[in-house]
Amino acid sequence: MTRLTHLDSTGAARMVDVSDKPSTTREALAEGQVVMAPETLALIQSGNAKKGDVLGVARIAGIMASKRTHELIPLCHPLMLSKVEVEVTPDEALPGLHVVARVKTAGQTGVEMEALTAVSVACLTIYDMAKAADRGMRIENIRLLEKSGGRSGDWRAA
Protein backbone atom coordinates (compact mmCIF):
# COMPACT_ATOMS: atom_id res chain seq x y z
CA MET A 1 0.00 0.00 0.00
CA THR A 2 1.21 3.51 -0.77
CA ARG A 3 2.35 5.52 2.23
CA LEU A 4 0.48 8.71 3.11
CA THR A 5 2.96 11.51 2.50
CA HIS A 6 1.47 13.97 5.00
CA LEU A 7 2.09 11.69 7.99
CA ASP A 8 5.43 11.02 9.66
CA SER A 9 6.51 7.63 11.07
CA THR A 10 4.53 8.27 14.28
CA GLY A 11 1.36 9.27 12.43
CA ALA A 12 1.71 12.99 13.13
CA ALA A 13 0.69 15.41 10.39
CA ARG A 14 3.50 17.19 8.55
CA MET A 15 3.98 19.34 5.49
CA VAL A 16 5.90 17.40 2.84
CA ASP A 17 9.42 18.70 2.14
CA VAL A 18 9.59 19.38 -1.60
CA SER A 19 12.87 21.31 -1.54
CA ASP A 20 14.83 18.56 -3.32
CA LYS A 21 12.24 18.02 -6.06
CA PRO A 22 12.95 19.56 -9.47
CA SER A 23 10.73 22.35 -10.70
CA THR A 24 8.61 21.04 -13.59
CA THR A 25 5.48 22.10 -15.44
CA ARG A 26 2.42 20.76 -13.67
CA GLU A 27 -1.20 20.95 -14.72
CA ALA A 28 -4.51 19.67 -13.36
CA LEU A 29 -8.07 19.57 -14.65
CA ALA A 30 -11.10 19.15 -12.37
CA GLU A 31 -14.87 19.25 -12.83
CA GLY A 32 -18.12 19.48 -10.92
CA GLN A 33 -21.81 20.13 -11.48
CA VAL A 34 -24.62 22.11 -9.93
CA VAL A 35 -27.93 20.40 -10.68
CA MET A 36 -30.99 22.64 -10.49
CA ALA A 37 -34.56 23.08 -11.69
CA PRO A 38 -34.89 23.93 -15.39
CA GLU A 39 -36.46 27.26 -14.40
CA THR A 40 -33.42 28.16 -12.30
CA LEU A 41 -31.08 27.36 -15.17
CA ALA A 42 -33.18 29.55 -17.47
CA LEU A 43 -33.08 32.39 -14.92
CA ILE A 44 -29.28 32.17 -14.68
CA GLN A 45 -28.87 32.02 -18.46
CA SER A 46 -31.11 35.05 -18.91
CA GLY A 47 -28.87 37.10 -16.61
CA ASN A 48 -31.85 38.02 -14.42
CA ALA A 49 -30.82 36.34 -11.15
CA LYS A 50 -31.33 38.67 -8.16
CA LYS A 51 -27.64 38.64 -7.23
CA GLY A 52 -26.39 39.39 -10.74
CA ASP A 53 -24.15 37.58 -13.25
CA VAL A 54 -23.99 34.10 -11.72
CA LEU A 55 -21.71 32.65 -14.41
CA GLY A 56 -19.20 35.51 -14.33
CA VAL A 57 -19.05 35.73 -10.54
CA ALA A 58 -18.64 31.93 -10.24
CA ARG A 59 -15.69 32.02 -12.66
CA ILE A 60 -13.97 34.79 -10.69
CA ALA A 61 -14.70 33.07 -7.35
CA GLY A 62 -13.13 29.84 -8.63
CA ILE A 63 -10.01 31.64 -9.80
CA MET A 64 -9.66 33.54 -6.52
CA ALA A 65 -10.19 30.38 -4.46
CA SER A 66 -7.57 28.47 -6.43
CA LYS A 67 -4.99 31.09 -5.48
CA ARG A 68 -5.87 30.69 -1.78
CA THR A 69 -5.93 26.90 -1.58
CA HIS A 70 -2.98 26.80 0.82
CA GLU A 71 -4.98 28.94 3.26
CA LEU A 72 -7.98 26.60 3.14
CA ILE A 73 -6.43 23.12 3.10
CA PRO A 74 -3.99 22.24 5.87
CA LEU A 75 -0.52 21.17 4.72
CA CYS A 76 -0.95 22.44 1.14
CA HIS A 77 2.04 24.37 -0.16
CA PRO A 78 1.55 27.97 -1.27
CA LEU A 79 2.13 27.96 -5.03
CA MET A 80 2.83 30.56 -7.67
CA LEU A 81 0.15 29.68 -10.21
CA SER A 82 0.87 30.56 -13.81
CA LYS A 83 -2.63 29.86 -15.17
CA VAL A 84 -6.12 29.34 -13.79
CA GLU A 85 -9.09 28.92 -16.12
CA VAL A 86 -12.62 28.28 -14.88
CA GLU A 87 -15.40 27.52 -17.35
CA VAL A 88 -19.06 27.43 -16.33
CA THR A 89 -21.25 25.89 -19.02
CA PRO A 90 -25.03 25.46 -19.00
CA ASP A 91 -26.12 21.85 -19.48
CA GLU A 92 -29.83 21.47 -20.11
CA ALA A 93 -29.56 17.67 -19.85
CA LEU A 94 -28.68 17.90 -16.12
CA PRO A 95 -30.36 20.46 -15.90
CA GLY A 96 -27.70 22.70 -14.41
CA LEU A 97 -24.21 24.04 -14.78
CA HIS A 98 -21.00 22.15 -15.52
CA VAL A 99 -17.87 23.68 -13.99
CA VAL A 100 -14.34 22.88 -15.22
CA ALA A 101 -11.09 24.31 -13.86
CA ARG A 102 -7.61 24.02 -15.35
CA VAL A 103 -4.65 25.10 -13.23
CA LYS A 104 -1.00 25.26 -14.26
CA THR A 105 2.31 26.03 -12.57
CA ALA A 106 6.02 25.46 -12.88
CA GLY A 107 6.98 24.17 -9.48
CA GLN A 108 7.92 21.37 -7.13
CA THR A 109 4.44 20.11 -6.29
CA GLY A 110 1.21 19.51 -8.17
CA VAL A 111 -1.87 21.68 -8.57
CA GLU A 112 -4.62 19.08 -8.14
CA MET A 113 -5.93 20.67 -4.94
CA GLU A 114 -5.96 24.10 -6.58
CA ALA A 115 -8.09 22.79 -9.47
CA LEU A 116 -10.47 21.00 -7.10
CA THR A 117 -10.74 24.08 -4.89
CA ALA A 118 -11.54 26.26 -7.91
CA VAL A 119 -14.37 23.93 -8.94
CA SER A 120 -15.71 23.58 -5.40
CA VAL A 121 -15.87 27.31 -4.71
CA ALA A 122 -17.31 28.08 -8.14
CA CYS A 123 -20.09 25.55 -7.43
CA LEU A 124 -20.68 27.00 -3.95
CA THR A 125 -20.89 30.48 -5.47
CA ILE A 126 -23.49 29.32 -7.98
CA TYR A 127 -25.52 27.84 -5.13
CA ASP A 128 -25.22 31.03 -3.07
CA MET A 129 -26.22 33.30 -5.93
CA ALA A 130 -29.22 31.20 -7.01
CA LYS A 131 -30.49 29.78 -3.71
CA ALA A 132 -33.30 32.35 -3.49
CA ALA A 133 -34.76 30.75 -6.63
CA ASP A 134 -33.93 27.10 -5.87
CA ARG A 135 -32.82 25.77 -2.47
CA GLY A 136 -33.01 22.22 -3.85
CA MET A 137 -29.92 22.60 -6.04
CA ARG A 138 -27.30 19.85 -5.67
CA ILE A 139 -23.54 20.13 -6.01
CA GLU A 140 -22.33 16.84 -7.48
CA ASN A 141 -19.48 14.91 -9.02
CA ILE A 142 -16.54 17.11 -8.04
CA ARG A 143 -13.49 15.17 -9.16
CA LEU A 144 -10.04 15.35 -10.65
CA LEU A 145 -10.11 14.56 -14.37
CA GLU A 146 -6.39 14.64 -15.10
CA LYS A 147 -3.01 15.77 -13.89
CA SER A 148 0.35 16.01 -15.58
CA GLY A 149 3.93 16.58 -14.53
CA GLY A 150 5.95 15.70 -11.50
CA ARG A 151 7.51 12.49 -10.27
CA SER A 152 4.29 10.47 -10.49
CA GLY A 153 3.79 11.47 -14.12
CA ASP A 154 0.50 11.83 -15.92
CA TRP A 155 -2.85 10.54 -14.70
CA ARG A 156 -6.31 10.56 -16.29
CA ALA A 157 -9.65 9.56 -14.74
CA ALA A 158 -11.26 6.43 -16.16
Curated annotation (Swiss-Prot):
The gene is moaC. The keyword Lyase applies. It comes from the Bacteria. PANTHER family: CYCLIC PYRANOPTERIN MONOPHOSPHATE SYNTHASE, MOLYBDOPTERIN COFACTOR SYNTHESIS PROTEIN A. Catalyzes the conversion of (8S)-3',8-cyclo-7,8-dihydroguanosine 5'-triphosphate to cyclic pyranopterin monophosphate (cPMP). Its EC number is 4.6.1.17. GO terms for biological process: Mo-molybdopterin cofactor biosynthetic process. GO terms for molecular function: cyclic pyranopterin monophosphate synthase activity. Substrate binds at L75, C76, H77, M113, E114. CDD domains: MoaC_PE. It catalyses: (8S)-3',8-cyclo-7,8-dihydroguanosine 5'-triphosphate = cyclic pyranopterin phosphate + diphosphate. Homohexamer; trimer of dimers. Pathway: Cofactor biosynthesis; molybdopterin biosynthesis. This is Cyclic pyranopterin monophosphate synthase. The keyword Isomerase does not apply. Belongs to the MoaC family. The active site is at D128. NCBIfam families: moaC, PRK09364.1. It comes from Azorhizobium caulinodans (strain ATCC 43989 / DSM 5975 / JCM 20966 / LMG 6465 / NBRC 14845 / NCIMB 13405 / ORS 571). Keywords: Lyase, Molybdenum cofactor biosynthesis. InterPro entries: MoaC, MoaC_bact/euk, MoaC_sf, MoCo_biosynth_MoaA/MoaC, Mopterin_CF_biosynth-C_dom. It is an enzyme of class 4 (lyase).
